[in-house]
């Protein structure tokens, strides 16, 4: 454990107000190791002065590597790319929200297209399917030298690598979902700067020192010709360390970094005096230097990890086109990084969803399986099962609304509760499922006391119930103040449950008014108060949706929802195009394939 601790990081909320009729425009694009034997080498810090010429060697597929004359900084991969995703969450091993879902779903989709893909995340728990590689490296964290180890498993065509260190395992063990960033919701670990500095350095070592042989197509270390995809502020040091520790010593000269913003409200702002803890040259200080205009836990001049990640990376991406448009539109929407993003530009690509876990035809949590041809017969039966499960009067004719999400201001759960009091007098039932802030949990649990035959609030983490609500509800309410992409609406549409959503971020990109759902308009993102205008938007839109319930038009909307392509296949193609644009000479676009890589060995852990 490092002896120096850092200050708290804070959360900043954007303040978004959208015109839902505005034209959606495409956001512009901007334009160290010692040689090791097997899996048992220890890589010293001073080994950065040496480099290995080891290249990835294929087992079954040819992979010609030729240099393009005059392009020494161009990645040379032959066919496919070497992609390294780095993040603090990767589903299903660790997940608190959309970040874990993306790192769980996008990498297999890219692997299925013929690329070699690795994910790197902390080992928060003793994952039973990940084995110790026996490879250890040393990294400098603050003023101490720390040894980290790597665990590995190979699933769905992806090398899943986990960074093992007490900073992760001893804090979080046993309760990954609730303790990744702090001991409880809203409270962060004091040493998060050090924890994620360690993660970034370990991630830069892994492609070069891990001799992985689980794939039918690739073997050996990934080498130095790689593309790093850094996700959110926790990994923003990757481009900085890449330049200062590696490329300055002639290592990773061809490597590039794409930085993906999943939620700009979380930026990693710390006291300016903490910069020396990062062990970066002074030339990087300007990229971190930041003075905010809001009242924040850390007073005065600060460092901003996300700002540095944006400025030092080769490409900036976010999780939907409309969210990208919001981020560059104003200081409140970009949470004071709008001007930086306008300078660098940002690309939005909508997320996909896990169509294997969320599949009404095979869902293990529902008694009735269905598809688009049988949905109209199945939904009433599933509604009755849901009503019985939560203790509401069983009546397949009454419209039922669901809400699934974190109980916090961003997700609009406080606005929802205020609105329920207004529309509960209509012919409707509602089931609310979520965990989060205690005051919000108490509010939803009071719903069944106030409206015993109309409402049910469940303040627990309950995966089976989430699936039952998604399948059995007629509508899914998504009242987010801001939503970079959102997954609940995708799950709902997959099951023929019509979204009623706020008009923000990815909700604008994925839900079509009157075709696959109902838009309520944009909400005031000031989190300290519930705006009566937003409550009215929910009430009026719910009434509008209920007026359509049971009609032929509603049946058509259900089928429209289920006809949408929601998997990771299309997003993976767009990600592939973007990453190829970073200069992967000799690489080729992938091929059509299933989300599980064809012929890949499944569930193979490193021996």
From Swiss-Prot:
Keyword vocabulary terms for this entry: Amyloplast, Chloroplast, Glycosyltransferase, Plastid, Starch biosynthesis, Transferase, Transit peptide
The organism's place on the tree of life at top rank: Eukaryota
Chain sites annotated for binding ADP-alpha-D-glucose: 95
Pathway noted in the entry: Glycan biosynthesis; starch biosynthesis
EC number from the UniProt entry: 2.4.1.242
Compartment(s) where it occurs, according to its Swiss-Prot or TrEMBL record: Plastid, Chloroplast; Plastid, Amyloplast
UniProt GO MF annotations: alpha-1,4-glucan glucosyltransferase (UDP-glucose donor) activity
Extent of the transit peptide: 1-77
Catalyses which reaction(s): an NDP-alpha-D-glucose + [(1->4)-alpha-D-glucosyl](n) = [(1->4)-alpha-D-glucosyl](n+1) + a ribonucleoside 5'-diphosphate + H(+)
Entry annotated with the keyword Metal-binding: no
One record GO biological process: starch biosynthetic process
Positions of the UniProt region annotated as Disordered: 585-607
Any single Gene Ontology cellular-component annotation: amyloplast
Principal location: plastid
Database matches in Pfam families: Glyco_transf_5, Glycos_transf_1
InterPro entries per the UniProt record, alphabetical: Glyco_trans_1, GS/SS, Starch_synth_cat_dom
Similarity comment text for this entry: Belongs to the glycosyltransferase 1 family. Bacterial/plant glycogen synthase subfamily.
Record-given protein name: Granule-bound starch synthase 1, chloroplastic/amyloplastic
Gene encoding the protein: WAXY
């Amino acid at each position: 454990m490092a002896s120096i601790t850092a200050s708290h990081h804070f959360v900043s909320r954007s303040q978004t107000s959208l015109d839902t009729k505005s034209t959606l425009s495409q956001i512009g694009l901007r334009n160290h190791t010692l040689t090791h034997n097997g899996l048992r080498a220890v890589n010293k810090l001073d080994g950065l002065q040496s480099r290995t010429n080891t290249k990835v060697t294929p087992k079954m597929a040819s992979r010609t590597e030729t240099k393009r004359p005059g392009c020494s900084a161009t990645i040379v991969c032959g066919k496919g790319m070497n992609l390294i995703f780095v993040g603090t969450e990767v589903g299903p091993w660790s997940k608190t929200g959309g970040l874990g879902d993306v790192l769980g779903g996008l990498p297999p989709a890219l692997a299925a297209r013929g690329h070699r893909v690795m994910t790197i995340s902390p080992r928060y728990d003793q994952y039973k399917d990940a084995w110790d590689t026996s490879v250890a490296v040393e990294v400098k964290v603050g003023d101490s030298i720390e040894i980290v180890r790597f665990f590995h498993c190979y699933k769905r065509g992806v090398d899943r690598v986990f960074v093992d260190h007490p900073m992760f395992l001893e804090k979080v063990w046993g309760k990954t979902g609730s303790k990744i960033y702090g001991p409880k919701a809203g409270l962060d670990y004091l040493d998060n700067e050090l924890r994620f500095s360690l993660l970034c350095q370990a991630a830069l070592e892994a492609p070069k020192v891990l001799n992985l042989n689980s794939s039918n197509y690739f073997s050996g270390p990934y080498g130095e010709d790689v593309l790093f995809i850094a996700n959110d502020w926790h990994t923003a040091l990757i481009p900085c360390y890449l330049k200062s520790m590696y490329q300055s010593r002639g290592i990773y000269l061809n490597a590039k970094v794409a930085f993906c913003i999943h939620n700009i409200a979380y930026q990693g702002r710390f006291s300016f005096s903490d910069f020396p803890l990062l062990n970066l040259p002074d030339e990087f200080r300007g990229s971190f230097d930041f003075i905010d205009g809001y009242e924040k836990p850390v007073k005065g001049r600060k460092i901003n990890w996300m700002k540095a990640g944006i400025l030092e990376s080769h490409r900036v991406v976010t999780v939907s086109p409309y969210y990208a448009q919001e981020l560059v539109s104003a200081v409140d929407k970009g949470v004071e990084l709008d001007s930086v993003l306008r300078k660098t530009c940002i690309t939005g690509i909508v997320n996909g969803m896990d169509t294997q876990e969320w599949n009404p035809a095979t869902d293990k949590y529902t008694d009735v399986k269905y598809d688009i041809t049988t949905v109209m017969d199945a939904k009433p039966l599933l509604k009755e099962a849901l009503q019985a499960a939560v203790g509401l009067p069983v009546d397949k004719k009454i419209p039922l609304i669901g809400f699934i999400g974190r109980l916090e201001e961003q997700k609009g759960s406080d606005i929802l509760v205020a609105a329920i009091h207004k529309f509960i007098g209509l012919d409707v039932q509602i089931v609310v499922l979520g965990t989060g802030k205690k005051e919000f949990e108490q509010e939803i649990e009071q719903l069944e006391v106030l409206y015993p035959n109309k409402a049910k609030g469940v303040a627990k983490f309950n995966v089976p119930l989430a699936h039952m609500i998604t399948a059995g509800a007629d509508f899914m309410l998504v009242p987010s103040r801001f939503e970079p992409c959102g997954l609940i609406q995708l799950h709902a549409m997959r099951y023929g449950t019509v979204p009623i959503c706020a008009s923000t971020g990815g909700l604008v990109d994925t839900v079509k008014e009157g075709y696959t759902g109902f838009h309520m308009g944009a909400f005031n993102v000031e989190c300290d108060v519930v705006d009566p205008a937003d409550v009215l938007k929910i009430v009026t839109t719910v009434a509008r949706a209920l007026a359509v319930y049971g009609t032929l038009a509603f049946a058509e909307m259900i089928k429209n929802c289920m006809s949408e392509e929601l998997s990771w296949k299309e997003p993976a193609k767009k990600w592939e195009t973007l990453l190829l644009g970073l200069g992967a000479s000799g690489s080729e676009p992938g091929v059509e394939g299933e989300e599980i890589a064809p012929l890949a060995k499944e569930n193979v852990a490193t021996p």
